Amino acid sequence: MLAKRIVPCLDVRDGKVVKGVQFRNHEIVGDIVPLAARYAAESADELVFYDITASAHDRVVDKSWVSRVAEQIDIPFCVAGGIKSIEQAREKLAFGADKISINSPALSDPGLIDRLQDEFGRQCIVIGIDSYYDADTDSYKVKQFTGDEAATKDTQWYTQDWVEEVQRRGCGEIVLNVMNQDGVRQGYDIKQLAMVRAICDVPLIASGGAGTMEHFLEVFTQAGVDAALAASVFHKGIIEIEALKRYLLDNGVQMRL
């Protein structure tokens, strides 16, 4: 059995790591490179960096900090933010990123997934999906440009349909960002993640809602995800990564220490 992964997420805005609640009211939590180095030293399996306003502001993630991170850490990391061409993806990979993630650009141009997969192979192509539960229609819908509250907009896609579409086009991994749960630390959306797991044949990363070690155990055992992503519990020191991994191991979840 493959070991499950613990993935700290670093949202980047204006060169700093920030964190919001339900994609709003972001506050600065630290500097990019020191935080990345800290998490690598604390036994994180992988890191994800999101330049959260890049797509909404029509720019691309800054390569300067990508190269600095690559020099400082020895674990895989993924970068996202405004990447919408083969050339931009190649640059980020050349500067040291192991994977690139696309979200809003893929919604604007789904064929981008095919082109990236053809060029680089699916193993380094991650699709981020910002999924919002609409209580009025009891459905999960995909939103776009979520890094800027003023720019956020609805799309034509229901989450299940978009999950199937991005797999058909060749993504290698999916990060499901559950917007309603983001930053509130009340637990992952097990129902939605299990629903997506049933139609997802590539590795699935859960994002949004982690508040306790028990929440991580629940998402691995009840939703069957391959990795759990979290931000505020790690940034604020609420959960220590190595202790979390030992807890999960003690409860039957395969982990690398």
Curated annotation (Swiss-Prot):
It is an enzyme of class 4 (lyase). GO terms for biological process: L-histidine biosynthetic process. One of its GO terms (cellular component) is cytoplasm. GO terms for molecular function: imidazoleglycerol-phosphate synthase activity; lyase activity. Pfam families: His_biosynth (PF00977). Pathway: Amino-acid biosynthesis; L-histidine biosynthesis; L-histidine from 5-phospho-alpha-D-ribose 1-diphosphate: step 5/9. It catalyses: 5-[(5-phospho-1-deoxy-D-ribulos-1-ylimino)methylamino]-1-(5-phospho-beta-D-ribosyl)imidazole-4-carboxamide + L-glutamine = D-erythro-1-(imidazol-4-yl)glycerol 3-phosphate + 5-amino-1-(5-phospho-beta-D-ribosyl)imidazole-4-carboxamide + L-glutamate + H(+). CDD domains: HisF. It is found in: Cytoplasm. Its EC number is 4.3.2.10. The active site is at D11, D130. Keywords: Amino-acid biosynthesis, Cytoplasm, Histidine biosynthesis, Lyase. Transmembrane segments: none annotated. It comes from the Bacteria. IGPS catalyzes the conversion of PRFAR and glutamine to IGP, AICAR and glutamate. The HisF subunit catalyzes the cyclization activity that produces IGP and AICAR from PRFAR using the ammonia provided by the HisH subunit. Heterodimer of HisH and HisF. Belongs to the HisA/HisF family. This is Imidazole glycerol phosphate synthase subunit HisF. It comes from Shewanella loihica (strain ATCC BAA-1088 / PV-4).
